[in-house]
């Protein structure tokens, strides 16, 4: 079964509405074309480190454009995004990544010290992707995110292709025990998406129909909670799938004033 998959959905949006906003954080705005192209750069890096179909790619990030870009990169080359709670300490991370066994991890510079500790306990990780947040330089064992996100020359697709059976792995927070990964088929996630725009996602994929339905930029949503939570990630995917945009706060702790200012904008 082919089924719907997010990479082709988002590529369809980027082709139809290339200049529509896709992400915004503070003064940073990313168009649908740039969102797609930057994800291609990350996807190319993933292929370069030797990933195979349905390898896991962990997002150890605060909210920001890089989170959704890296998720899209995973989908493009048939990998499984893995949400990672940025509040975890080294032991909790070692457990989570020991369970998920990611082939690659993308992380904010703020977490360098913690990652340094965990690296020795996660030898299966082939590549570490560093997102500069002004807190520390990129370590020699990692690759700078900006250096790969801006280098794509074409759309990325792995030899094994894409289909709706490929997964998204959502881990619980572990509040009632150890974190557990919930395996979602992409086609099932699409079927459960709330309708946030003009197109109705039918049982059988119809990417041409999606393109015809998109005539203008869609609605905007504000991901006020962390993208590492299913609420924010799944809502964001639903909005982006209809040509909409996702805004995130610049602060790393909840700021009601910034949130309301963003709502007004």
What are the language-model segments listed below?
Residues 193-221, 228-265:
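Conserved AMP-binding/adenylation subdomain of ANL enzymes
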Residues 48-49, 76-150:
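Structural core segment of the AMP-binding/adenylate-forming
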Residues 57, 74, 105, 166, ...:
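Conserved S/T- and glycine-rich ATP-binding loop of Class I adenylate-forming
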Residues 19, 152-171, 177-178, 183, ...:
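Conserved pre-ATP/AMP-binding loop-to-beta segment of ANL
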Residues 31-33, 167-195, 199:
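Conserved AMP-binding A3 loop
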Residues 56, 62-82, 86-90, 98-104, ...:
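A short helix-loop-beta submotif of the ANL/AMP-binding
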Residues 1-4, 136-166:
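Flexible, low-complexity linker/hinge segments
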Residues 2, 21-64, 68-72, 89-94, ...:
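Conserved AMP-binding/adenylate-forming core of the ANL superfamily
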């Amino acid at each position: 079964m082919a089924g719907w998959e997010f990479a082709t959905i988002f590529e369809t949006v980027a082709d139809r509405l290339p200049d529509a906003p896709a992400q915004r954080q503070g003064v940073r705005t990313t168009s649908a074309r740039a969102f797609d192209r930057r994800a291609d750069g990350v996807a190319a890096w993933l292929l370069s480190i030797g990933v195979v179909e349905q390898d896991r790619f962990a997002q150890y990030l605060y909210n920001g454009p890089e989170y959704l870009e890296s998720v899209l990169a995973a989908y493009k080359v048939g990998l499984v995004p893995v949400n990672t709670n940025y509040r975890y300490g080294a032991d909790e991370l070692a457990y989570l990544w020991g369970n998920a066994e990611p082939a690659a991890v993308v992380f904010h510079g703020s977490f360098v010290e913690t990652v340094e500790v965990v690296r020795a306990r996660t030898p299966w990780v082939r590549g570490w992707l560093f997102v500069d947040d002004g807190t520390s330089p990129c370590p020699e064992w990692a690759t700078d995110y900006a250096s790969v996100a801006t280098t794509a020359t074409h759309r990325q697709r792995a030899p094994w292709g894409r289909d709706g059976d490929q997964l998204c792995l959502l881990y619980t927070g572990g509040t009632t025990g150890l974190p557990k990964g919930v395996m979602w088929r992409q086609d099932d996630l699409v079927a459960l998406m709330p309708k946030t725009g003009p197109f109705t996602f039918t049982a059988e994929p119809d990417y041409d129909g999606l393109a015809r339905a998109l005539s203008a930029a869609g609605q905007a949503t504000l991901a006020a909670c962390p993208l590492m939570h299913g609420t924010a990630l799944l809502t964001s995917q639903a909005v982006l799938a209809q040509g909409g945009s996702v805004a995130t706060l610049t602060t790393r702790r909840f700021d009601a004033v910034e949130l309301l200012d963003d709502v007004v904008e």
